[in-house]
């Protein structure tokens, strides 16, 4: 019986790359994202290429009710999740901390922190009961140090690091493992989303002589 991996934010970028890698290893996949069309295309690709079983879970990770319903009502053959990849996340805008859009702050915090925590709470108890499991949180090097215009996003990724460290401590008396992966800049749609679809803005650098650079 193949192992099962559940990946959030799987429709593109790092999430889709993770799905392809696990598919190569013969995993049964539970793929989550908001974009049903992209998920369906990925499902077809993976099932055709690797002959694996893929179940789609199209919901917004910020929707606690939808997340709980999807995970607690999984068909029996998909319930024994071996690997959870908390990948769903985003950055919005490059405004100064005191001048940003409140709705953007809410979206980043709800997606990058709260949803990760809620999904983990839904999946980990089953792993503990089965005596095995691996939680992989996709953090960022941005969680180690802030950069101009990114303080809120950086704060959310710092939270991912702390949540990962804390969960690892909480599970120290179990066989479960916790990994916090911290990528740097990756060529995905991440920056396009950040700038509301403005691809030119993604290529603009930071102006010189920021306060932090002054001597």
Where are these regions (language model features)?
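Conserved glycine-rich cofactor-binding loop
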Residues: 11-12
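Conserved glycine-rich Rossmann-like NAD(P)H-binding loop of the short-chain dehydrogenase/reductase
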Residues: 25-41
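The beta1-alpha1 cofactor-binding region of Rossmann-like NAD(H)/NADP(H)-dependent oxidoreductases
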Residues: 36-37, 58-69, 102
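Substrate-binding pocket helix/loop in short-chain dehydrogenase/reductase
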Residues: 95-109
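Active-site helix of classical SDR
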Residues: 120, 156
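Residue(s) in the substrate-gating loop at a strand-loop-helix junction
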Residues: 140
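C-terminal helical subdomain
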Residues: 176, 180-184, 188, 200-215
């Amino acid at each position: 019986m193949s192992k099962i991996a559940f990946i959030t934010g799987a429709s593109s970028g790092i999430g889709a790359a993770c799905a392809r890698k696990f598919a190569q290893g013969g995993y049964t996949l539970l793929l989550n994202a908001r974009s049903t069309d992209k998920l369906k295309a990925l499902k077809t690709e993976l099932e055709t290429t690797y002959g694996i079983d893929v179940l789609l879970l199209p919901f917004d990770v910020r929707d606690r009710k939808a997340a709980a319903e999807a995970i607690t009502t999984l068909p029996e053959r998909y319930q024994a999740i071996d690997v959870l990849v908390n990948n769903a996340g985003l950055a919005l805008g490059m405004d100064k901390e005191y001048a940003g859009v409140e709705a953007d702050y809410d979206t980043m915090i709800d997606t990058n922190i709260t949803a990760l925590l809620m999904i983990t709470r839904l999946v980990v108890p089953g792993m503990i009961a089965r005596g095995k499991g691996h939680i992989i949180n996709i953090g960022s090097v941005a969680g180690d140090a802030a950069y101009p215009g990114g303080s809120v996003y950086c704060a959310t990724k710092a939270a991912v690091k702390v949540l990962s460290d804390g969960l690892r401590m909480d599970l120290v008396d179990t066989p479960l493992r916790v990994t916090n992966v911290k990528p740097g800049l990756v060529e995905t749609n991440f920056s396009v989303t950040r700038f509301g679809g403005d691809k030119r803005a993604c290529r603009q650098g930071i102006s010189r002589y920021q306060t932090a650079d002054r001597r």
